[in-house]
Amino acid sequence: MIDITLPLTDIHRHLDGNIRAQTILDLGRQFNIALPAQTLETLIPHVQVTSTEPDLVSFLTKLDWGVKVLASLDACRRVAFENIEDAARNGLHYVELRFSPGYMAMAHQLPIAGVVEAVIDGVRDGCNTFGVEARLIGIMSRTFGEAACLQELDALLAHRENITALDLAGDELGFPGSLFLSHFNRARDAGWHITVHAGEAAGPESIWQAIRELGAERIGHGVKAVEDRTLMDFLAQQRIGIESCLTSNIQTSTVASLADHPLKTFLEHGVLASLNTDDPAVQGVDIIHEYHVAAPAAGLSREQIRQAQINGLEIAFLSDGEKRALREKVAAA
């Protein structure tokens, strides 16, 4: 189902949600950190979703073991490098990796700006080694409150030239976007693109707020948009992209089943929706699974899957020239 003549992208992919189980085991042993299991086979149920979680917050706890072993900046650098290696193995030409530096720093009180620098270094080394193009999106983890998000923002702004966009993720219901208006004003002043997790746990009003008040150019997940016809029209007319993550939305119980997922409806409505993974290591999936298994199960035709692939580059945070160069590179391969 993947069109090999077109660039393959993943623009909603959490770096800190893609820490390999083997790496968790390795770093746990290196830093003498107590883990819930001592072999790869027995560790996987603790760090990977093996059945549907009751809600988003329950799903997010699966990510915690990955960041609990980040006891040094070198460990952060390693997982960033491995994220690019994983992208290359999946056949991705372009990836936007998003990460929450405060979340990664928290367990071992690492310097947040140091985490940002380590991630930048690891991703750069990975791109040079594996030939994948990547951009970084900084996340503010709303779950930890406004002050913690301000610390993350300051750390990201210290490396603003290496960050492409700002995102807001975490507990959407408990910490609405309205709490973070000043944060996003600073991000836009820095010249960053804006994408926001919205309409995943909360309703379409959360998406409207992200667009109108935070300046979102893309929406992460956005499944509740289908509940508001005016919003659907607005998304299509204003070319505001939707970063769809099929398997993730089932695992978080955001959507009941793949057959119920709104991605097909988005595409039929002319919304620029794309296919992405979200947290590959935690979910136990990759981009190939999303195209070959999840998308057909969600009712997408071959042409709709191809359109989602086209949309992935169309709404990527790249210049028109960069998009054209990537298309030409893939076509010539």
Swiss-Prot record:
* Reactions catalysed: adenosine + H2O + H(+) = inosine + NH4(+); 2'-deoxyadenosine + H2O + H(+) = 2'-deoxyinosine + NH4(+)
Which residues make up the annotated site Important for catalytic activity? 221
Q: Which residues bind Zn(2+)?
A: 12, 14, 197, 278
* Alphabetic keyword roster: Hydrolase, Metal-binding, Nucleotide metabolism, Zinc
Top-rank EC class of the record's enzyme: hydrolase
What is the recorded function of this protein according to its Swiss-Prot or TrEMBL entry? Catalyzes the hydrolytic deamination of adenosine and 2-deoxyadenosine.
Q: What is its EC number?
A: 3.5.4.4
Q: Which GO terms describe its cellular component?
A: cytosol
Q: Where does substrate bind?
A: 14, 16, 170, 279
Cofactor(s) it depends on: Zn(2+)
Q: Which GO terms describe its molecular function?
A: 2'-deoxyadenosine deaminase activity; adenosine deaminase activity; zinc ion binding
Give the protein name, as stated in the record: Adenosine deaminase
What species was this sequence derived from? Salmonella dublin (strain CT_02021853)
- Quote the cofactor binding remark: Binds 1 zinc ion per subunit.
| Pfam families referenced in this protein's UniProt entry, alphabetically | A_deaminase (PF00962)
UniProt superkingdom: Bacteria
Entry similarity comment? Belongs to the metallo-dependent hydrolases superfamily. Adenosine and AMP deaminases family. Adenosine deaminase subfamily.
Active site located where?
200
Share an example GO biological-process annotation for this protein: hypoxanthine salvage
